[in-house]
Amino acid sequence: MSKSEIASNPLEFPDPMRFADEIEQIKKIKFNMDKERIVFTGSSSIRMWKDISAYYPEHQIINTGFGGSEMSNLLYHLEHMVLKFAPAKVFIYEGDNDIDAGRPIPLIMEQTEKVVEAIESKFPDCQIILISVKPSLARWHLRSSYGKLNHELEVFASKNANRKYANVWAVMLNDRGVVNPSLFIKDGLHMNKAGYDIWDRVIRPIVES
């Protein structure tokens, strides 16, 4: 994505430079090129998974989450967030903020395709995992739009053997099909440890595969 595209479409592409401080911190991440690298990137649900490495101690996990981000921001900063690490696997969580900001699903998917194809063009053997948007108390009113986006993400992932779709939506609902309130901190949007433990049930088999 070019700077001119962003400047000419401010409603479609939120300012990526608002993440400058976080990007500078991510640039300082130390990693071992002699050990397989697994990158988790995306918005605050990734950024706030502070102890993710403790979940998968036998793997080199690199967390490049940046809170409040949208798929277009990930595309803009892809070199720092993903490509520089030459990863074997990339887990991507975006779309949550995109829908909340009113971005149309076709635009979100266009940006998703660009992100995935940019990774695949440089690292054709890299496995790319698209994590579904999660349900939350704060954004439960957007569940229909999230459901439509998740369907599109799943279909897109199914088109390539090196892509996967990680459905965290379903496991975060209770027996009545409503989001489980015990999985969130007070804001009703971000998860507590119980929420991440639920995510682990979906993500672990992919990490270990």
Where are these regions (language model features)?
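Conserved beta-strand scaffold positions in the cores of enzyme catalytic domains, especially
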Residues: 40, 61-63, 165
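N-terminal secretory targeting modules
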Residues: 1-40, 50, 54-55
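A short helix->loop->beta-strand "cap" motif at the edges of active sites that frequently abuts
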Residues: 123-127
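Acidic/histidine-rich helix-loop elements
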Residues: 7-14, 61-71, 100, 188
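Catalytic His-Asp segment of secreted/periplasmic serine-dependent ester chemistry enzymes
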Residues: 137-209
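Oxyanion-hole/transition-state-stabilizing segment in secreted/luminal serine hydrolases
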Residues: 46-55, 60, 71-109, 129, ...
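Charged helix-capping and loop-helix junction motifs
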Residues: 105-115, 145-150
